């Protein structure tokens, strides 16, 4: 992107109206720009042909569309594609496109690295390098080659979305607004380890689905796996969820990586049943994908199936998530731009 120019991508309609008003353009120009951006996906201001040439030149003096193409991609044998996107700060983030029949999900990142330092996650080993701007986040969708095929977006890539909440909310607003992508909020899922105050604000200000990283119902063990337990316990997260209605369109899910010999016992299953009693939710069981220098191991398929069956039998809707893109380090817990830099894969 050009220096000293503001990206138009991720600007709200009100912001576009204010920007064009300051440049002396007609009142309706902001809405025209929004249609070019979010309706047509233009790459250059000169493509906005119903703006006069004089107004396009005014706009170009201060703004640019802001779309940045991925600089690298890797394709898995299962069809999953991992893209490497540049950011305004000069850093890079990974984004994963997951086709599945007539559905296509995009897993987007909200930060470069992550502060949460979960034991089992490669992104946490990268450390925290900074928040993405709203334009950085939305660009992962805006500049995706398969953009027109997308049916869902999940904020489950690099970073903790609640730790960059202002920008995440801005992006979900643009995605769901009539002037924007005009998506239903039920096409969007935002994940979190549980961040005090931020999680409540997200629930209040958004209608998108929410996915909570549980990984253990036992506080001491969860704290060992996820230091964020000390900031907001899983019990506090569940108590907060009881204040909201998940019986209609909005969905609540708990993510649970199953580690062999650690959190895969029937004791854990019973504790989950007790923990979520009376809460409309689902549990997604996830296979652990081995990362370097971490002494954790995945549970067997048989163990995962019996765990799922126990939860289901006791009224907790439970699925085993299919792993995708493991061969290109695109599966759950494997994203790390630092790993790509060190291996010389970045171009």
What do the predicted segments below correspond to?
Residues 76, 109-110, 191, 213:
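Short linear Ser/Thr-Pro motifs
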Residues 81, 93, 104-108, 116, ...:
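Generic beta-strand structural signal
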Residues 99-136:
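Canonical Radical SAM [4Fe-4S] cluster-binding loop centered on the CxxxCxxC motif
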Residues 145-152, 157-321:
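Conserved AdoMet/S-adenosylmethionine-binding subsite of the radical SAM
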Residues 135, 139-147:
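Ferredoxin-type iron-sulfur electron-transfer modules in oxidoreductases and energy-metabolism complexes
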Residues 89-98, 102-103:
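P-loop NTP-binding catalytic core
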